[in-house]
From Swiss-Prot:
Entry similarity comment: Belongs to the COG6 family.
Membrane topology: Peripheral membrane protein
Organism, as annotated: Arabidopsis thaliana (Mouse-ear cress)
Function: Required for normal Golgi function.
Protein name: Conserved oligomeric Golgi complex subunit 6
Length: 680
């Protein structure tokens, strides 16, 4: 029955709602906890009055809240009253401000207008101040330019004038050209007056520099000279003034050093040593070099070259050209300063050269003048009066040296010595070589400046030794002419001197060649050239000359060997036949020719073998050649040349085309055997 009867719809919904309600939700748990705080009896009456109980509880809570909010409400009411009062005050103030704004609007507009005018006036004032600074001189600057006393303020004012003058050029590019021209004219007047005054002051200061030997250049004077460089004409006047003053002062000091010496006589006068040319000239050059260093330092400090060089490193080409012009002025002043000492120096050096110094002294003087010529030109410049003077006296000393050599050489050539019996060099050769070695030592020890180099030594060697060699050649020629009428004799000693073999008879009957009388003269020349060459081998400076002498010796050795070989072949009767053996081109065999017939050739070869196989003295040994190496070399060359000549003859004899009947009996020694016999 219960399953068939359904529940009422409202109850069913409520029941479903209760069943669907989640008992673990936080709100439900909180509600139940709050209910348990005042619902403590679970009875039927209490459950029926649950709603009313809850509503009473809610009313109680609201009543408590209202009681608690009464004081707050009272405070809020008071605040509202005060806010209303404050709003009334603000309204009154706003009304007062509105009335004030209406009354002060004219004042505010006037103030704004005046403020804008003040800004414009301030800008104009700044522009005027900038214009006055860039285009006008202050009273203090004008006073500094016109005062008699020069100080740093003068140079600052002058620099400002130059700046204003440069700024005026900018005005000329605008529509203010008239103002620019007027300002430029005004600044030009100030500038020219200042430069003229500056020039007079610098000239006065420079006159003070000429009164002392070692003046000090103040920084103010350096600045003044640096400023004067902007006016080349005025600067040149001052530079000439400095040059003239120091010129006179240096001349007086040089004459005093020559004649009076230093203070109290120390150092002693330079002319005390006039008897010693080297020291005399060296002391004068040393004094000039020391004075040049001092004067150069003075002019260098005065013109402030280092500062100009430093400033030009970062500037354009035109300023570098200006720097070169400054260096030219620097050289001009130094040149002017030292012009005065040129003449007394030149006169004294010429007097030394006219006193006929010795050859060594004149050469040392030339080297000393050469060294100082380069040294002073490095400091002063090459195209200056002092350098030209030193160059002139150096040339004069060099001319004196070569004139002495020329006179000495002419004397040797005028009176050539006779040739000694042993063909040894004459004493003049040894003296000339000794003198040459001494001059070489002086050349090797001469001073050379950093920019200079040693002069060529070959002309000195030629002037020294060429006349000696020519003298030896003349002596040799005279010796040869003396013996030209005599026939040379050569003796040959055998074991039995009373008997002559057929070979000896042939040799003695053969006419001697005309070249034989040249042998002693050639040996004499070789000895002389070796006497010159040997001492020079240790010196590099004479290497080229030694090489040339070696070529001459080689040439004389060749001629000597050829003459001796021709003499030997002529004695054997082979001299005129060698050309036939070397260039036999005729169809007629050599055996059928009269001069190369077997009988004639047999006699000639017997004589040749007699020379080769004979006793000592048959072949020349050149005992009078004083250099063993050359003597041995000459003997070897003679032997080689004879062996080569015999080989030509042997090949012609053994050649079947020449038709010799018994070549082996005719030329019984092969060439190798002859070489062995000759020791080659």
């Amino acid at each position: 029955m219960a399953s068939t009867v359904g529940l009422a719809p409202g109850l069913s919904r409520k029941l479903k709602k209760v069943l669907d309600c989640r008992t673990d939700s936080p709100d439900l748990v909180a509600s139940l906890n709050a209910l348990s705080s005042f619902y403590d009896e679970n009875s039927a009456h209490a459950r029926r009055n649950l709603r009313s109980t809850i509503e009473k509880r809610a009313l109680q809570i609201n009543s408590e809240f209202l009681n608690a909010a009464d004081s707050t409400q009272i405070a809020l009411d008071r605040v509202e009253e005060e806010v209303n009062a404050l709003a009334d005050c603000c309204d009154k103030i706003a009304a007062a401000l509105s009335s004030s704004a209406a009354t002060t609007s004219d004042i505010i507009s006037t103030t704004e207008r005046l403020k804008q005018e003040l800004e414009v006036t301030t800008q104009r004032q700044e522009i005027v101040n900038c214009f006055l600074r860039d285009y006008q001189l202050s009273n203090e600057e004008i006073k500094a330019l016109r005062e008699d006393e020069l100080n740093e303020n003068f140079f600052q004012a002058l620099s400002h004038v130059q700046e204003i003058h440069s700024n005026c050029k900018l005005l000329l590019r605008t529509h203010h050209q008239r103002a620019g021209l007027e300002l430029m004219d005004m600044m030009a007047v100030y500038q020219e007056g200042a430069y003229e005054r500056l020039c007079r002051w610098v000239q006065a200061e420079c006159r003070k520099l000429g009164d002392t030997d070692n003046p000090e250049v103040s920084e103010l004077l350096r600045t003044a000279v640096r400023c004067l460089k902007e006016r080349p004409v005025l600067f040149k006047y001052c530079a000439e003034e400095v040059g003239n003053l120091r010129h006179n002062a240096l001349f007086r000091r040089f004459i005093s050093a020559l004649t009076r010496g230093g203070p109290g006589g120390m150092p002693r006068p330079i002319e005390v040593h006039a008897h010693d040319p080297l020291r005399y000239v060296g002391d004068m050059l040393g004094w000039l070099h020391q004075a040049l260093a001092s004067e150069r330092e003075l002019v260098h400090a005065l013109f402030d070259i280092d500062s100009a060089d430093h400033q030009s490193n970062a500037k354009n080409t035109s300023e570098n050209i200006a720097l070169k012009a400054g260096e030219s002025d620097f050289t001009f002043v130094l040149d002017r300063i030292f012009e005065g000492v040129c003449r007394p120096f030149k006169v004294r050096v010429e007097q030394v050269l006219q006193s006929q110094p010795s050859l060594i002294i004149s050469y040392k003087l030339t080297n000393t003048l050469e060294f100082y010529s380069y040294t002073i030109s490095d400091l002063l410049g090459r195209d200056t009066a002092l350098c030209n003077t030193i160059g002139m006296v150096k040339d004069a000393a060099q001319k004196t040296f070569f004139d002495i050599l020329k006179t000495r050489g002419e004397k040797l050539l005028r009176y050539p010595p006779p040739v000694a019996v042993d063909l040894s060099p004459p004493p003049a050769v040894r003296e000339g070589v000794s003198l040459t070695l001494e001059i070489i030592e002086n050349y090797n020890s001469m001073m050379v400046s950093a920019s200079g180099e040693k002069p060529a030594f070959d002309p000195v060697l030629s002037a020294l030794l060429d006349p000696i060699i020519k003298m030896c050649e003349q002596a040799a020629e005279a010796h040869k002419s003396k013996k030209s009428g005599q026939l040379p004799r050569r003796s040959r000693t055998s074991s039995d001197s009373s008997q002559l073999t057929s070979v000896d008879a042939l040799l003695s009957s053969s006419p001697s060649p005309p070249q034989n009388n040249e042998t002693p003269s050639k040996i004499f020349l070789i000895n002389c050239l070796c006497a010159i060459q040997q001492p020079l081998l240790r010196h590099d400076v004479a290497s080229q000359y030694v090489t040339n002498i070696g070529l001459m010796i080689e040439n004389h050795i060749n001629l000597l060997v050829q003459n001796e070989v021709d003499t030997l072949l002529h004695k054997c009767g082979l001299s005129d036949k060698m050309q036939i053996f070397r260039s036999s081109t005729s169809e007629l065999p050599l055996s059928e020719r009269q001069d190369t017939s077997p009988a004639m050739l047999s006699e000639c070869l017997k004589a040749f073998f007699g020379l080769v196989l004979g006793s000592e003295g048959s072949l020349p040994e050149f005992e009078q050649i004083q250099v063993p190496k050359l003597r041995s070399e000459a003997c070897v060359r003679v032997a080689k040349t004879l062996a080569e000549a015999y080989e030509v003859i042997y090949q012609a004899v053994t050649d079947q085309q020449n038709g010799y009947p018994d070549p082996k009996s005719l030329a019984r020694h092969p060439p190798d055997q002859i070489r062995t016999i000759l020791g080659i």
